């Protein structure tokens, strides 16, 4: 059993790509950090744990299906969560969507009372679910997610609208229907309407605040 002084609460936030997961995660982090201090709460993105592809050619890397569970290094993520729970610091990998592989640098994270973990495939892995104290699924209509994703990938990741649409049709939507949507059944809380659902955010804040008492 984990020593009381080293307890780290893991809260999983999942949902479709561009559903509002990151907005909810960042809002919760920012508002709770202002209450308790950043030494007590942190955020980890599942995106940081895409598998290293430095051994592949660029031609091979660009074919990666980022919406399939096999693209994730969940074993490393689970190891890192267990390290945090045992009081150890971790080095979170960083991923380059331009190079389609991990960067050289990492982000150092010390033990926190609460870690907010966000990502599209979190609830698809039973091992990962077992590491969470509770989980949230952000339930946003796919057409809204597509519009948000197109804006994000064109503006922030330098992609063309045609390539974003092609990826959506070939992998994003099929993988959502095959893996992500079915994982909703494992969520403890379902949040409709994405990251601007203020009532849901306030309820989640109240729930998470209990872990700081």
Curated annotation (Swiss-Prot):
Gene Ontology cellular-component annotations: cytoplasm
Top-rank taxon, per record: Bacteria
Protein name, as recorded: Uridine kinase
Enzyme class: transferase
Keywords associated with the record: ATP-binding, Cytoplasm, Kinase, Nucleotide-binding, Transferase
Pfam families: PRK
Gene Ontology terms describing biological process: CTP salvage; UMP salvage
Record keyword Transferase present: yes
Designated gene of the protein: udk
Lineage, opening ranks: Bacteria, Pseudomonadati, Pseudomonadota, Gammaproteobacteria, Enterobacterales
Keyword Kinase: yes
SUPFAM superfamilies attached to this UniProt entry: P-loop containing nucleoside triphosphate hydrolases (SSF52540)
Annotated residues for binding of ATP: 15-22
Bridged cysteine pairs (disulfide): none
NCBIfam families, per database record: PRK05480.1, udk
Molecular function in Gene Ontology: ATP binding; cytidine kinase activity; uridine kinase activity
């Amino acid at each position: 059993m984990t020593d009381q002084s080293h307890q780290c609460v893991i809260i999983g936030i999942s949902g479709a790509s561009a559903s509002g997961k990151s907005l909810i995660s960042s809002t919760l982090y920012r508002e709770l950090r202002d209450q308790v201090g950043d030494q007590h709460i942190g955020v980890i993105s599942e995106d940081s744990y895409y598998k290293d592809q430095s051994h592949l050619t660029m031609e091979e890397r660009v074919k990666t299906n980022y919406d399939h569970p096999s693209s994730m290094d969940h074993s490393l993520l689970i190891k890192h969560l267990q390290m945090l729970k045992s009081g150890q610091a971790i080095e979170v990998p960083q991923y380059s969507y331009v190079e389609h592989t991990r960067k050289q640098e990492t982000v150092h994270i010390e033990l926190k009372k609460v870690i907010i973990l966000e990502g599209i495939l979190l609830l698809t892995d039973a091992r990962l679910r077992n590491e969470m104290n509770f989980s949230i699924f952000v339930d946003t209509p796919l057409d809204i997610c597509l519009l948000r994703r197109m804006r994000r990938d064109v503006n922030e990741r330098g992609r063309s609208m045609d390539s974003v649409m092609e990826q959506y049709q070939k992998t994003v939507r099929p993988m959502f229907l095959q893996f992500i949507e079915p994982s909703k059944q494992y969520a403890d809380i379902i949040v409709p309407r994405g990251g601007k659902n203020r009532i849901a955010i306030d309820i989640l804040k109240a729930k998470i605040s209990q872990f700081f008492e």
